[in-house]
Amino acid sequence: VCSSDLELFAGGWDESGYVNGSGVTARFDNPRQPAFDQDGNMFVPEYGRHTIRKITPTGEVSLYAGLPGQAGFTDGLPEKARFNKPECVTVYLDNSLYVADRDNHLIRRVTVE
């Protein structure tokens, strides 16, 4: 017999929005398919806010790339980058992040030096 538990890790089921913070105090707007880096950080494309959010193994949620609510196409530093409905992320071996930027019709690469 298998037994498992399902528990809320980050965000709130009853309210969407954009709030960074710890665990269930954070809010998301249409999060999509996440990916994990080698350190256990989770990267979540936020379709509704055009951002990539980072969740640490302890549950701290922060902005990783993009500007909340600002759709567009801009390359550059993560805080200057603009996405248009990011849907999926993959973390490569060097910890660079590949983003399926849906409405820009592109695969984007995010690196932090």
Describe each region flagged by the PLM:
Residues 1-3:
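Short, small-residue-biased leader/transition segments that mark boundaries at the very start
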Residues 5-32, 60-87:
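Gly/Pro-rich loop segments of beta-rich domains
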Residues 8, 50-54, 60, 105-109:
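A short loop-to-beta-strand structural motif that recurs across blades of beta-propeller domains
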Residues 32, 53, 87, 101, ...:
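Specificity-determining residues in the recognition alpha-helix of C2H2-type zinc finger DNA-binding domains
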Residues 36-39, 91-94:
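Residue-level detector of Asp-centered blade-edge/turn motifs that repeat once per structural unit
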Residues 41-43, 96-99:
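Conserved beta-propeller blade signature
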Residues 47, 102:
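Short loop/turn segments immediately following the C-termini of beta-strands
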Residues 111-113:
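Short loop/turn segments immediately following beta-strands, especially the blade-tip
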